[in-house]
Amino acid sequence: MTDISYYNNEIDKILWNILGDDYFTQDEFDDLVNSVANTIYQYDNEVSIDKLKVIIEFVILNKFKICYIYDNDSILNQVKYEKKSVGSKTIGKNSTNDDEDDDEDIAVIKLSDIEAGENWFKKSPKISSKQFQSVDKVEVATYEDLISHKHDYPKEIYKESHYIRRNTRLDVIKKIPQFEQKSKEWLKQRTESLTATAISVVFDEDPYKHPIVILLDKCGRGLPFVENKFVHHGNKYEQIGTMFYSFRNNVEVGEYGLLQHSGHKFIAASPDGICSKKANTGGLSKLVGRLLEIKFPFSREINNSGDLDGDICPHYYFLQVQTQLYVTEMDECDFLQCKIDEYDSWEDFVKDSNPIVPGLSKTTNLEKGCLIQLSDKNLIGSDDKEKCLYNSKYIYPPKLHMTNEEIEKWISSEIMNYHNNDLSENYMIDRVIYWRLSQVTCNLIKLNKEAFEEKIPLLQQFWDYVLFYRQHSDKLDKLIKFVEKVKEDNSAEIFSYINEDFLSLNKDSKYEPLYQEETEWRKKYNQIKAKKAQMYKNKSYNKYTKFSN
């Protein structure tokens, strides 16, 4: 049987013709293997084509090291394979290095040693194409190799003007008083403004709500918020997303609560985070002032292609980010989307451990970890399982990339010392949840200030309507009855009524009714809604016809 060194030499020749000294990505790997295999098989068919592919995979992955490509401007997660080096030289067909250790190691391996490649592939799991991107060209031998240093700022003080401006603005934001949650001041602040999550609705560019819903809510007559599985899932894992982003980008991420625009107090936003200094050394970062918005979709697919506004980032989230940028007076936001899986057991969690890097999933090559779920004592035994879940609170680990032993010690410590936790009076430990990230995308969104400011007059008029009905509860009661009659999706008729009401007591106003024409986004949503309705109608008709016959 032909020795492995023979195939090593043949593969080298073909790779040089295809790649030269270039690299290839994970997405190109299968095509590369097929090309090399088909070429060799034309003149040497001693082994089957399938076994030949296994040999080629083995040889190539011994010659190339895995690197990560991280670029916030990119919509793709990629893995890059770059030629391994010996000393300071690159191994390749034209290499003059006399000490080519990697090739010598391959040469002494027999075909029987890699029988179908099974043992080797078990030891060296491939990196998933869903891997979070990293610009740093490093072999991952430790979790610290996962940190991107792309955004580290090398100087002791900021020199570039845009970093100086962001840092100065961040200092101002840090000094803004933050009120205790649920306090009178906290509640009052929320009644004084339209928050970022409401802006898409006020623009009539939200698929789920119509503008009148926000107006009634701001007048204290809206439906009470009821948490659902989608909101709870996002809130539950938001801190994990922050920890992941902070670690991978070597940056501290701070939370600053609800912020109001300096000139338009009726517009407010609360970003998930704002970046500041480097996390590991406290030095400067080029990410200073960049906002972070995190989404953990419960069922929505994460899209990596198409338009940033609408396809990759759903339009209502895009407007949320634009509002956050406008309010904070920053210019960039990273939109981080993560898919997360929960393990069924500790045993499954342990089995899925990366053999080299603690805290990485062997399956996804993304972070994994745990958190402790706490349940409300007053709801123990309740038949309302959803209410029990949505009232849960969580204890998060101090860091990512803990070894399994460290995780066990942390869980034991939290349980033993839980009586010292402030939450222990009203909450009890329910269970430990083990999770892994399965997909991560990070896309840079920049402020379009001109486009946003074009909508300020609409927001101002809408807010004037809110203030008007707050002062005239009798007219608000009549408005509610009118909305019940015409239905909340009839925005044109509702806001004609509202504008007439407003002008009756504001004779000098030049306001024209809002929402007299459908926005382009509303048209798009209505088309999608109509298609779905027709689809369900057809299904129901077919089902009826089937049973009728």
From Swiss-Prot:
PANTHER family: EXONUCLEASE, PHAGE-TYPE/RECB, C-TERMINAL DOMAIN-CONTAINING PROTEIN, EXONUCLEASE, PHAGE-TYPE_RECB, C-TERMINAL DOMAIN-CONTAINING PROTEIN-RELATED. It comes from the Viruses. This is Uncharacterized protein R354. The lineage of its organism: Viruses, Varidnaviria, Bamfordvirae, Nucleocytoviricota, Megaviricetes. InterPro entries: Lambda-type_endonuclease, NF-kappa-B_Signaling_Reg, PDDEXK-like_dom_sf, Restrct_endonuc-II-like, YqaJ_viral_recombinase. It holds the Pfam family YqaJ.
